[in-house]
Amino acid sequence: MQEPKQTRVRYLILLMLFLVTTINYADRATISIAGSSIQKDFGLDAVTLGYIFSAFGWAYVLGQIPGGWLLDRFGSKKVYAGSIFTWSLFTLLQGYIGEFGISTAVVLLFLLRFMVGLAEAPSFPGNARIVASWFPTKERGTASAIFNSAQYFATRAVRALDGLDRLHLRLAARVHRHGRPGHCVLAHLVDGDLRAERSPAGYAAEVRSSPHGGLVDLEDSKDKKDGGPKWDYIRQLLTNRMMMGIYLGQFCINALTYFFLTWFPVYLVQERGMTILKAGIIASLPAICGFLGGVLGGVISDTLLRRGNSLSVARKTPIVCGMVLSMSMIICNYVDADWMVVCFMALAFFGKAIGALGWAVVSDTSPKQIAGLSGGLFNTFGNLSSISTPIIIGYIIAATGVSKWRWSSWVPTHSFAAISYLFIVGEINRIELKGVTDEPATTAHPGELLPTTRKV
């Protein structure tokens, strides 16, 4: 029998994930660049602005577990397509709020942003689910790092572009610019297919080109027919030491991202006296370093794995080293020059990005029956920082009147992330659920190479 020709379909899939994630984060970052103007125009204090910044996070967190359940119930393609369509629609609708009075416009803006948060909820669990299906273990770190690094690419683009547009002058143009690309990507998604089973020969070639790989068939589960995963599965994840360590680590890692997406541009304008245009450009520089660090972290992890190191060593080494490097942000408390603040912020963001391998770890550990739900639970913990970080910083500034203390909060936060992976997570393995009603989680597609499993 002729050997199927090796394909590169998975790289096209990865490109699609990168583009979707870029659009996802571009929408999240749009409001922060105008934060200083919003605060001035509406007479808001720091605490109130912090709550406004966290509004998206409330909806996003609330939607994680339902979004993950939908992925497991209906599959990646349908839910992913519906998510992109819905959040792009609500983003486009924000362009029309200028037709209303100020009070009504503000209410509508945040209602629409709330809906965008709900609609975007399945995106990252969907990404992790797709990566687990298409990429072998020894490529999964790089693949996860690439789609995750899209957040830095998006932030760099938004900071530079939105520095040219004031929120109260060009809101319609801005949201239309961010909403339309989502529908373009959606068209390609619907035309294609995220499931490997559509091309059996191509799937076999992908498997054969993935030595010791552990591709995981996430679409073939009887849980779909049984009405979705049981809540007992969530209890098993929440009582698993490894998973709780991963969740805690992700919360700490994400905190710096949300500081950068919310308060950093405001800091540059109010404390450093920069114009919105200059702040938008300057704030994009750490994002470039974050993008490079994100990709590098995945490459380092997969290189360690290919050289014979265990999965635990390969994933934990970049995470811990990256968290240590990110603590360099504390130096910003003791320098005055703008360029030094930006340089140390860039260094910290570079380190944080190297260590942002949480989604690779989730792809390595999630039970195949509830891969979407597991990713949603992971993202729920991670994005609790999107709610708490802006609010906590607002209270720090209001209570102390010294905004530099915002830099100090990241040292214990990232210390906890490193400690969590070193002492709580333990050995990284794919977990196996108790009380599964369909075939065991280790059942493979023909030719599939099995991941390591362990009981919860």
UniProtKB/Swiss-Prot annotation:
Transmembrane segments: 11-31, 51-71, 78-96, 102-119, 246-266, 280-300, 317-337, 341-361, 381-401, 408-428
Gene3D superfamilies according to UniProt: MFS general substrate transporter like domains
Single GO cellular component term: plasma membrane
Topology of this chain in the membrane: Multi-pass membrane protein
Compartments in which it is found: Cell inner membrane
Catalytic activity: galactarate(in) + H(+)(in) = galactarate(out) + H(+)(out); D-glucarate(in) + H(+)(in) = D-glucarate(out) + H(+)(out)
Keywords assigned by UniProt, alphabetized: Cell inner membrane, Cell membrane, Membrane, Transmembrane, Transmembrane helix, Transport
GO molecular function: transmembrane transporter activity
Keyword Flavoprotein in record: no
Xref: CDD domains: MFS_ExuT_GudP_like (cd17319)
Protein task: Probably involved in the uptake of galactarate and/or D-glucarate.
Family statement: Belongs to the major facilitator superfamily. Phthalate permease family.
Protein name (Swiss-Prot/TrEMBL): Probable galactarate/D-glucarate transporter GudP
Lineage: Bacteria, Pseudomonadati, Pseudomonadota, Gammaproteobacteria, Pseudomonadales
